[in-house]
Amino acid sequence: MKTLIITGASAGIGLATARRFADAGYAVTNISRRPCPLPSVNHLPGDLSNAGFLDTLGDRLSEALAGADAVSLIHNASRLLNDSAADTSSDQLRAVMEVNLAAPNTLNRFVIPRMPSGSSILYVGSTLAEKAVPNSFSYVVTKHALVGMMRATCQDLAGRGIHTACICPGFTDTEMLRAHVPEEAMDAVRGLSAYGRLIEPSEIADTLHWAAENPVINGAVLHANLGQVER
């Protein structure tokens, strides 16, 4: 059986992705503080902001990986703050890096040795992985670094039959977006898409599933943003 290990599948893109992979016959395990509401998903409670989050999960995660024909590891969970280069403390930056960068590295070190050929490691980036906007300093910094992590992963795993990619969603209708963008600004955000709408989480889930099944995109950054209008 194919196995999906995903972080942050309690809502938004993560939840839609867990559903998409489960529908495709994957055994799905989620790691997050809040449980994934899908009854078929194996939930491992973990706080990715805690550097030792795997200390209590290792045995159960090993069980989830045991006997898998192929493993897809999706680094979906992330933290987004309203902050800027002028006022973000190093402690605040480290806290965001713990979730957005260190946790993926921790999981990679654990999961990669247990991955058979035919597996994949997918990073959920953002349009802000290759550009910047004001007041999203730590998010922009860490998402840029996530692209570097993906590219380094690709090079380091060459010849092992494990492919990787970074999928960069545009403005997606998630709890995170609505918490970050005031309601009165949502029409303007929709206008930044060539289609004049927000992306549905299921559209990103479909993209992630396709990426997991197609190693030809190994090392690629895939923009999933409906054609973002530059202004």
Model regions and ranges:
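N-terminal Rossmann NAD(P)H-binding glycine-rich loop of SDR-like oxidoreductase domains
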Residues: 10, 18
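Substrate-binding pocket helix/loop in short-chain dehydrogenase/reductase
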Residues: 84-86, 92-97, 189
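Active-site loop-to-helix junction immediately N-terminal to the catalytic Tyr of the SDR YXXXK motif
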Residues: 88, 132-140, 152
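Active-site helix of classical SDR
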Residues: 108, 142-143, 150
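Alpha-helical segment proximal to the catalytic Tyr-Lys
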Residues: 113, 155-156
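Residue(s) in the substrate-gating loop at a strand-loop-helix junction
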Residues: 126
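C-terminal substrate-recognition "lid" of short-chain dehydrogenase/reductases
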Residues: 197-224
